[in-house]
Design a protein with these regions (language model features):
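N-terminal leader/linker segments that initiate helical-solenoid repeat arrays
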Residues: 2, 19-63, 259
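Structural signature of tandem alpha-helical TPR/SEL1-like repeats
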Residues: 32-38, 69-78, 104-114, 138-151, ...
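Conserved structural position within tetratricopeptide repeats
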Residues: 45-48, 80-84, 116-120, 150-157, ...
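Short helix-capping/linker turns of helical repeat alpha-solenoids
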Residues: 48-52, 64-66, 85-88, 100-102, ...
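Hydrophobic face of amphipathic alpha-helices that form TPR/SEL1-like repeat modules
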Residues: 57-64, 95-100, 129-136, 164-171, ...
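Register position in tetratricopeptide repeats
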Residues: 64-66, 100-102, 117, 136-138, ...
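Terminal, low-structured helical/coil segments at or just beyond the last alpha-helical repeat
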Residues: 163, 170-180, 189-197, 201-259
Length: 259
């Protein structure tokens, strides 16, 4: 009995020693919400430290209301801080918002400011938008067909070249009009698509500028017919209006409207 008691004591010592050793706990993976909160705090810290990427991201979050309370003023403030550090996406965001006039009131002077800073970094999109700003004018920006054509020329895509042809044919200021050049550019663009309604419209305006109203009328009719194959272009009323002017031997004068 004595030996059994000793054995029992030894067993209990072993059991107790096992219970007293550290117990490894199960690791609970963080929730999606906690991960997002952690990332948000990290972004906020980096933004306050002056990191342009973090400032831009936090600004977008404030504008959209994603992960934070929606606050347009605060969002623009963060994006502006990033833009001042030459963060080109932040600059484009401010420029596009000021140009579009949807989330904030349209301000072409502010849009011009940021697009010009983007131009300094070699951005082609900024040249394209500046072309529209200078061709339309307003909101503190003086309309200038010459500057508009310069910007569209640097952008260099087919749409921009078509806009140059349109300005050459229709600009209200006579010193910027050149019907012959507008015809040449439009015919060149038509080589890629003989039924492009916009290019045909440009060509008709160019013929009218030269005083060749017969060619203008024929070409404008082709443009109107081409619209039927391009239902996404909802401008039939404008096309018909121009046709009537050409039928009355009148050239068309217009600035490029803002998009």
């Amino acid at each position: 009995m004595k030996k059994l008691s000793q054995i029992g004591i030894i067993v209990w010592i072993v059991v107790l020693s096992g219970l007293s050793s550290p117990v490894k706990a199960f690791v609970i993976p963080p929730s999606i919400e906690s991960q997002a909160a952690t990332k948000l705090v990290h972004i906020q810290i980096k933004a306050k430290q002056g990191n342009a990427d973090a400032q831009f991201l936090l600004g977008l979050m404030n504008l959209s209301g994603r992960f934070v309370t929606q606050d347009t003023k605060q969002g623009l403030s963060w994006i502006n801080l990033a833009a001042q550090q030459q963060h080109i996406k932040a600059q484009q965001t401010l420029a596009d918002l000021a140009f579009d006039g949807k989330l904030i009131p349209r301000d072409l002077a502010q849009a011009e400011k940021w697009y010009l800073q983007m131009v300094a970094q070699g951005d082609k999109w900024a040249h394209f938008r500046l072309g529209f700003i200078y061709s339309a004018g307003g909101d503190g920006v003086v309309r200038n067909c010459g500057k508009a054509m310069e910007q569209f020329s640097v952008a260099g895509d087919a749409v921009s070249l078509g806009n140059i042809a349109w300005i050459l044919a229709t600009c209200p200021e006579a010193q910027y009009r050149d019907g012959s050049r507008a015809v040449s550019m439009s015919l060149k663009l038509l080589e890629h698509n003989q039924n492009d309604p916009t290019v045909l419209d440009n060509l008709a305006a160019a013929y009218a500028e030269l005083g060749d109203f017969s060619a203008a009328i024929d070409t404008q009719k082709k443009a109107i017919d081409a619209l039927k194959d391009n239902p996404e272009i909802v401008r039939s009323d404008e096309f018909i209006l121009r046709l009537k002017q050409y039928q009355n031997n009148q050239a068309y004068r217009e600035i490029i409207p803002l998009m």
